[in-house]
Amino acid sequence: MQTKSGKNNAKTMFGIDNIPVDNHVRNILDKIDPKSFKKIYEDILEECQKLKIINQFVFMKKYILVALDGTHYHSSKKVKCSCCQSKTDSRTGIINYFHSAITPTIVHPKVKNVIALFQEFISNKDGQKKQDCEVNASKRWLDNFNFFNQKYKLIILGDDLYSRVPMISKIKEKGHSFILVCKETSHKILYEQIERFKSANSHKTVTIEKMHNGKKQFFTYNFINGLLLTGGNIDNAEVNWCELIITNLEGKKLHTFSFVTDLKITLNNVEEIVEGGRTRWKIENENNNTLKTKGYNLEHNFGHGKQYLSQNLCSLNILAFLFHTIQELYDTLYMELRSNLGARKNLFEAMNILTSMFTFINFDKMIEFILISRESDEQVPLKDFILLN
């Protein structure tokens, strides 16, 4: 656009005077410590608090639910560095080198959107004998995240990998609570206790009738407080256990969900606690899956670099997703546009086409133009929205 008309959308929309070539950007990003982006994420969170966006995510009146999960964002069979993790194919012997990160996300059972937080990269260090892992990276993230300490208490959500004594101890050490998936196959001692309680009919239970897709289902909640996670006397954790069994009218079991938590479970709150635990799936569906398949292409190899390029490209990608989320939660014009266009990909494609053809007066004018063009049967006058030569 700059070459054709002497104007460009980077200048009119975002105030960028000089646009560097992509290789120059990569060279700059490669040298920047990834932790430098943390302050940007925190500034956005601070604005979310001022705008009361965070209020939508308050759970059980005083908590914020944060789901933890790991995801890959770069892989190659040739390009590698000292920070790469690796996995050897047992059949072919071929080594795959990859980068991954913990992508913490604020979630809420009643809110469609999620708020992405600053990542913790799973990264091998020089001299390290064992590869870094998801749990260790999650512990580091807990050590470094203290944004809500004064106002809200966090409830950490995680899959069965997290419901172990070391992780629970770290969560409690940082002053947080937890609702973690707890599978029978990996918690033998805990479930032996549960079976004893069930056999003696000493557990609490409540069944609620609900409608799902026009069909009646029964949600049965079972819970027991004050169990030991493992059999050890020293390295142990006291937990409260709950499960949800969903059955249909014929009594067929459709789904079972089970969790451990440090929150005291009662007949009045068991449904809400289980609902909070189940919200963990939003980190996979609304966060990681969106980043990979809905237009952000997180797993695409945008570049590896010699130092920090791949980490920083990952962080910037998630930052873009965060900005779009905040717009969707607060900006009425953007909300209307998303509702009108549906999938994010549709919006990205429309923007890509329009910005390659026209220089808009500003970002809002582009949004208005897309909306009016879709809603009006008459031709929209371009002069009201773009800069003319």
What are these regions (language model features)?
Residues M1, V21, V25, K62-Y73, ...:
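Short, conserved catalytic/metal-binding motifs centered on acidic residues
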Residues M1-E42, I171:
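Short, positively charged, Gly/Tyr-enriched micro-motifs
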Residues Q2-K4, V206, H212-F219, K292-N389:
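A short, flexible helix-boundary coil/loop motif
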Residues R26-V111:
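Active-site-proximal, Lys/Arg-enriched surface segment
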Residues T88-K153:
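Electropositive, glycine- and tryptophan-enriched low-complexity nucleic-acid-binding patches
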Residues Q128-I189:
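Domain-level cores of phosphate- or acyl-group-handling catalytic modules
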Residues K183-R280:
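An anionic, glycine-rich sequence signature occurring as long contiguous blocks
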Residues L267-F302:
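Short amphipathic alpha-helical "interface-anchor" segments enriched in bulky aromatics
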